[in-house]
């Protein structure tokens, strides 16, 4: 447990992510007979928790690795997280997305500074 806590404390995510609230879910709590709280990661700049992992990974790369850029495969939120993390850190981010990706998703990646490559129909 101590190792896990140490990893959390060392994670560098708050340069780009925000601390999101835990909101009570009274109806769900009543239905389940327990206090239920919802972590509001939809309030992040890319509307997802995936920004945290993407930024933390880029922050742990060496200068040489960052200068080479990063590439990922995503049809949405992870790609947006990588794009924003790359933009924030000055790292080239190439996001490979299926050709079937909705335009709104690929445009969101581009708007965050990611280079979109549309390739293939699926991930299979």
Residue ranges and their predicted role:
Residues 1-124:
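PLP-dependent amino-acid enzyme catalytic core
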């Amino acid at each position: 447990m101590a190792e896990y806590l140490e990893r959390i404390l060392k994670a560098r995510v708050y340069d780009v992510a925000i601390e999101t609230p835990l909101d009570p879910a009274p109806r769900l709590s009543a239905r389940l007979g327990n206090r239920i709280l919802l972590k509001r990661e939809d309030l992040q700049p890319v509307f997802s928790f995936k920004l945290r992992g993407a930024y933390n990974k880029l922050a742990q790369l060496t200068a040489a690795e960052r200068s080479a850029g990063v590439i990922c495969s995503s049809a949405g939120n992870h790609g947006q997280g990588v794009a924003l993390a790359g933009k924030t850190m000055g790292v080239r981010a190439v996001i490979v997305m299926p050709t079937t990706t909705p335009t709104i998703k690929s445009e969101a990646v581009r708007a965050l500074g990611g280079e979109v490559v549309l390739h293939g129909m699926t991930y299979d």
